[in-house]
Amino acid sequence: RKQIFLACKTGKRNSQESRLDLENSLRLLKTDYVDLYQLHGMKTKDDFIQATRSDGAMETLVTAREEGKVRYLGFSCHSIEVAKLLIDHFNFDSILFPVNWALILKNDFGPELIKICKDKNIAILALKAMAHKLWDNPSIRKYKNCWYQPLDDTKMINLSVKFTLSQPVVSFLPP
């Protein structure tokens, strides 16, 4: 177990449901702790408000860390605004968000958050390193759980991965 790093997530925003998610993950994984537990899909200010109120999911994360059931706390996010709110209010160990050359060049999405994370020593786990664009026709998407079209050209994939790994990320999740 010490040689494996287990990360789990909860999409629940209240303490009771997020605690059930955690306990279920521990049971299914047959372990008494996970290394990283993440608030998943923090997209809106409402997600932030729900997760951080007195009976919110953050209560579960903090308590679980105190109990030794979780070593590190993190969140996944596609909103710079929400990510900054979370970072300003809690001491997170990691963030999972898109680090992709196209998003940075076209929308300036990422550089500010990368700097904040670097300054606060928050580990960056990169998503969507090989994203190309939204599917033109989502009904014919090749990968059922992938809402964007990944790159399919080997040279572009290599360049995209090289770019993502040139950023201060600790890992990336393909595609």
Enumerate the language-model features and the residues they cover.
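Active-site groove signature of glycoside hydrolases
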Residues: 26-48
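Short beta->alpha linker loops
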Residues: 10-13, 77-79
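N-terminal binding-site loop/beta-alpha segment at the start of enzyme catalytic domains
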Residues: 1-4, 60
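Beta/alpha (TIM)-barrel catalytic core signal, keyed to glycine-rich beta->alpha loops juxtaposed to Asp/Glu
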Residues: 42-175
